C-alpha cells in the first residue's frame, strides 16, 4: 500500500486528502479530514451505459455512523437504520453541484458513497464531504468537469468568517454554503437573519474566492493520484434527423408554447410530438424513437429560450419581471389552530399550523449531539398537484429538501421559547404546482402562523427567479414556471422580509453566471418579494391577538426549584395524579419553571391551585384547615398542605384536660389548626385550641 496524501490549510483547519490505502477496489476512494472530522468517500461507475437509458443515473448516499462520535445507536437492533433528515439534506447538498459537471449524454451509472467515520462536534461534516467527493471524482477517471470547491460562510460582527465552528455559528447572522468550480458558482444554500442583498451577494463572492485553495489542491492531488480518464465520447447527433425534426415540429412547438394554461399546453405539445414521430416513422420505420424524443426535447428548449432572449412574452404571456396573479386567504379551516391558502398562478399551497407543548417538540439525536426543534415544517407534494397518479407515502428527498428550505425562510422570524412557550408544527400541502411550490410554502406558512396567533416578528414571502443566457445576452425571470425552471439555466429561490433575506438557494446549470447577473436577480427578487408581502398583509398583516379556542393554552408559573421533587412525588405519583385529575399537561424545568397546558381554562386554574398548595411554605401563626390522618397516644397528626403534616400534642387539643385523644378527634376529621412552630428539622407543631381562640377573637 502506497498512500498518496495532500494537506493544505483552509480557514481555521488543516484539510487532508488521502488515497491508496482504504477501499482500493472502488474506482476511487478518498479519506478526507478537516480537523478531527473524517469522511470516507468512494466512487464507482459502470464502464458501459445500460441499453435504452435516457437519463444519467447518479446516486449520492451520505451516511453518518454513530461510532464516529463514540456512540452506540439506540433502538432494539442497535444499528443505523434509514437515513435521517440531516443525512438526506447533506446528500442533496453534495448531489446538486456535482450533477451538472458530468458531460451531456453521459448515461453510465455512477454511485458516490460518503461515510462519516470520525466527527469533531465543532466541525460539521458537510463541507469536508463535498471536498472529499470532488477529490474522489477528480481521481476516478470518470468524465467530470471538476474540481469542485466548497465553503461555509458565517457573518459575525459585520465580518465574513470562513468555515465557522458550530459554536461560532450559534452567534452568526448567516449560515451559507457555496460550491463551485474555479470559474463559476454552481450552488448556494443559506439561512440568514434578514440580511441585506449586498451582504448576501458578498458572502457568495467571498466563499467562492476562498475555495480556490481547495480547487488548486484537488487539481494537484489529481495530478499525483488520478487514474486515466475513461475513453468516452459524447454521442453524435444525426444532422439530417435534426433538420427533419426542426422542419416538422418547430412551428408547432412555438404555437403550443403560446398556450397559457399548463394542461392545455402540455396536451398540444404532445400532439405536435406525436405527429412528428408519425411522419418520421412513415419515411423510416426503423428510426430510433428514443433519439427522436431527445431531439424533440432539445428543440423544445431552444424554442422557449429563443423567445425569451428575443424579448417576446413568456410562456404564460408575462413580462420578465411580472408576478402571476395572487390569491391569499387566511383562516380557511375551522378546527385547525391556524390555516391559509396561498395561490400564485397555477401553484397553490394549503398550509396549516398546529400548536403543542414542549413535549411535542422534535428531539434529534445525531452524531453532532442532541438538540430540540420547537419549530417543524413539513412539505408534501402529492401527485394530484400536477395532474398525475403516483405513490403516496413517506416523504421523498425532494419533499424533505423543500420543507427545509421553507423552514430556513421562516425560522429567523420565529419567537423564542420565552416569548411563546409552544411547539409549532406547520404542514404545507401542495395542492397545485407549476413552479416555485417551496416559495409558496414560505408565504403560506407566514400566513398560517399569523392566523394561529404565533407572534412572528414580521411577514415573510418567497420568490423563485430564473435565468436564460445565450452568449452575452441574458434575461432574469421573476416567479418562474415549472417549464422555465426545467428549460432555463438557473433556479434562484429567495425568501425574506421587507428588511432582508432569510433564505437563499441557488442552483446553476452553466458557467458564466457573473456577480452582475446575481445582483440583478437579487434586486429583481426584492421587488417581487415586496409586491407579494403587500398582498399578503391585506389578508392578515399581523398575528391574531389570541390563539385558537381549539389550541392548548400554556400558562407559565414559577416555583422554588427545591419544591420540584414535591410536585413530582415518589415515582411521579403526585404529578401523574395532577395531570390525570385535572386533564392538563404539566412540564417542569430545573429552574422552577412550570408550564401548564390545557384547552380548558378552569382545569388550568385547578392545576395551578394544587401546585401552589404543594409548593407553598408552612407559615408560623397561620390557621389552616387540616385533616386528621393519624391518632397516637400523645396527640394527632394533621395534614395541612399536600405533603405537609404536623403534630397536635394532646395538650393542644382543648383548654380542658384531655385523657383520651380519640374522645375528641377521629380519623379524616377536618379541623382548624394554628401553626405554632417549625423547627430546624422541618417538623411542624400545631394547636387546635389556639386556632379556636384566634377564631373566637376574630368573631368578636
Curated annotation (Swiss-Prot):
Location (main, coarse): cytoplasm
Keywords: Cytoplasm, Magnesium, Metal-binding, Nucleotidyltransferase, RNA-binding, Transferase
Membrane-traversing stretches: none
Cofactors demanded by this protein: Mg(2+)
SUPFAM superfamilies linked: Eukaryotic type KH-domain (KH-domain type I), Nucleic acid-binding proteins, Polynucleotide phosphorylase/guanosine pentaphosphate synthase (PNPase/GPSI), domain 3, Ribonuclease PH domain 2-like, Ribosomal protein S5 domain 2-like
Example GO biological process: mRNA catabolic process
This protein's GO CC annotations: cytosol
Pfam families: KH_1, PNPase, RNase_PH, RNase_PH_C, S1
UniProt cross-references to CDD domains, sorted A to Z: KH-I_PNPase, RNase_PH_PNPase_1, RNase_PH_PNPase_2, S1_PNPase
Residues the entry annotates as binding Mg(2+): 485, 491
Locations listed in the record: Cytoplasm
EC number from the UniProt entry: 2.7.7.8
InterPro entries in the record: ExoRNase_PH_dom1, ExoRNase_PH_dom2, ExoRNase_PH_dom2_sf, KH_dom, KH_dom_type_1, KH_dom_type_1_sf, NA-bd_OB-fold, PNPase
Assembly behavior: Component of the RNA degradosome, which is a multiprotein complex involved in RNA processing and mRNA degradation.
Family to which the UniProt record says this protein belongs: Belongs to the polyribonucleotide nucleotidyltransferase family.
Entry function: Involved in mRNA degradation. Catalyzes the phosphorolysis of single-stranded polyribonucleotides processively in the 3'- to 5'-direction.
HAMAP family noted in UniProt: PNPase
Protein name: Polyribonucleotide nucleotidyltransferase
